[in-house]
Amino acid sequence: MRRAVCPGSFDPITNGHLDIIARASKLYDVVHVAVMINQSKKGLFEVDERIELIRQVTAEFGNVEVESFHGLLVDFCKQRDIPAIVKGLRAVSDFDYELQMAQMNIGLSGVETLFVPTNPTYSFLSSSLVKEVAAWGGDVSHLVPPAVLEALNGRLKQD
């Protein structure tokens, strides 16, 4: 069985993330979406909320499993016998950083990294940008799935 992981904080998941996960789900039998837990960073959504949103928006793929992780991604991969990490690249700056991580990961554990170029429609997109635009009342409906838009608008009204 071919397995891969798509890691990230997904705070919140965007259409760019979803595009990479969808494309990975066509290449692998099982795609694990690993939601990073970063104790030093307070997210807009709790980890459990992010997991639930990702499960909702990836349900149609049928081969995506979503869970959280804390620590080294290669340890997550080793514990689950996952030989590949799938990463989307938006720009050259992403490549510079991700190449270093990929080289470290293969050196630590033999886990390969597959770089997938982002759909040009989403080349500028990040969760941080979505949160900032939405917080100022901008329309982000074309940048996130409907379930995420609803959760995002609800959360921003609370704050």
From Swiss-Prot:
Enzyme Commission number(s) of this protein: 2.7.7.3
Coarse class of the protein's main subcellular location: cytoplasm
Residues carrying the site annotation Transition state stabilizer: 17
Gene Ontology BP annotations: coenzyme A biosynthetic process
Residues holding ATP: 9-10, 17, 88-90, 98, 122-128
Gene3D superfamilies: HUPs
Subcellular compartments: Cytoplasm
A GO term from the CC aspect: cytoplasm
Cofactors (names): Mg(2+)
Listed pathway(s): Cofactor biosynthesis; coenzyme A biosynthesis; CoA from (R)-pantothenate: step 4/5
Domain of life: Bacteria
Residues where substrate binds: 9, 41, 73, 87
InterPro entries for the chain: Cyt_trans-like, PPAT, Rossmann-like_a/b/a_fold
Keywords per UniProt: ATP-binding, Coenzyme A biosynthesis, Cytoplasm, Magnesium, Nucleotide-binding, Nucleotidyltransferase, Transferase
Catalysed reaction, written as an equation: (R)-4'-phosphopantetheine + ATP + H(+) = 3'-dephospho-CoA + diphosphate
Class of this enzyme: transferase
GO molecular function, one term: pantetheine-phosphate adenylyltransferase activity
Keyword hit for Cytoplasm: yes
A Pfam family annotated for this UniProt entry: CTP_transf_like
Role: Reversibly transfers an adenylyl group from ATP to 4'-phosphopantetheine, yielding dephospho-CoA (dPCoA) and pyrophosphate.
HAMAP family reported for this sequence: PPAT_bact
Subunit structure: Homohexamer.
Family according to the record: Belongs to the bacterial CoaD family.
Protein name listed in UniProt: Phosphopantetheine adenylyltransferase
